[in-house]
Amino acid sequence: MVQIVSQDNFADSIASGLVLVDFFAEWCGPCKMLTPVLEALAAELPYVTILKLDIDASPRPAEQFGVSSIPTLILFKDGKEVERSVGLKDKDSLVKLISKHQ
């Protein structure tokens, strides 16, 4: 299941384990197209927590991590950024990106 986070709980949400964060905005077309891909990833890769952060409602984490284009996906391992992907990606590409850090 993909969960929505805010800037208030962002740091705690990425602190442990493997966490993929989708930095998105409600008005972003490619972001909307990415949602079913993330849902499929969540079902296929239960060892990864998948989160979505609305950069308009919660801008601080996006600023902190230098997110300037959306969708941006950042993979965190125990709170540290290990991978970044900008733009719409297919499920297979994201599985490869994540599996390197399993």
From Swiss-Prot:
Organism: Chlamydia muridarum (strain MoPn / Nigg)
Disulphide connectivity of cysteines: 28-31
Task performed by this protein: Participates in various redox reactions through the reversible oxidation of its active center dithiol to a disulfide and catalyzes dithiol-disulfide exchange reactions.
A molecular-function term among this protein's GO annotations: protein-disulfide reductase activity
Origin organism lineage: Bacteria, Pseudomonadati, Chlamydiota, Chlamydiia, Chlamydiales
Domain of life from the UniProt record: Bacteria
Name this protein carries in UniProt: Thioredoxin
GO cellular component: cytosol
UniProt keyword annotations, A-Z: Disulfide bond, Electron transport, Redox-active center, Transport
Gene designation per UniProt: trxA
Family according to the record: Belongs to the thioredoxin family.
Entry annotated with the keyword Transport: yes
Keyword Electron transport: yes
GO biological process: cell redox homeostasis
Thioredoxin domain segment(s): 1-102
